Amino acid sequence: MGILDYNSAVELLQQNQELNDFVGQCSEQLVKKAEGKLNVIFPQTYRDFLLTYGAGNFGSEEIYGIVKEDFDNSGIPDAIWFTLKQRKEVNLPSNLVIIYHTGGEEMFCLDFNRLGKHQEPAVVSYVIGVDLEFQTYEIIANDFGEFLLQRVKMELGIS
């Protein structure tokens, strides 16, 4: 459940700070600028992640977020830059925002066409190179909180 899972993930992040390598806090103004650039409104859990951590790594788990204000000239792990780049290069649908790259052809995205009861988008899989009509958009997590908790637990070896 979104906020509860998110709070559990944050607690684990705080307990294991030696694994944290995050960009750092973003301002509310920068988050709003990112939303405008992507034409979405971020869910509360992802917004809190951006405001608190920005983007970065927990061990080997890299969560995309906001790196800097210049979204056109940024790089990984900037979710805004990478999403805009993929929209241009591979026709990534505008309802998807990339938050994680598996290292292969698969990316995990917030899907703003699949909102849960608290207006939290599901996290779905998008495979580069697969035509849009053949994408399955497998649900990886019901929301960002669940997704973040999964990734943090995976890094810690907790089931």
Regions found by a protein language model. Give the residues of each.
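Ampiphathic alpha-helical segments that act as solvent-exposed interaction surfaces
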Residues: F134-I158
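Segments surrounding the PLD/"HKD" phosphodiesterase catalytic module and close analogs
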Residues: C109-I139
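Low-complexity, compositionally biased segments
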Residues: N73, W81, I98, R114-G116, ...
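N-terminal non-cleavable signal-anchor helices
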Residues: K32, V124-S125, A141, K153
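A surface-exposed partner-binding patch
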Residues: M1-M107, V152-S159
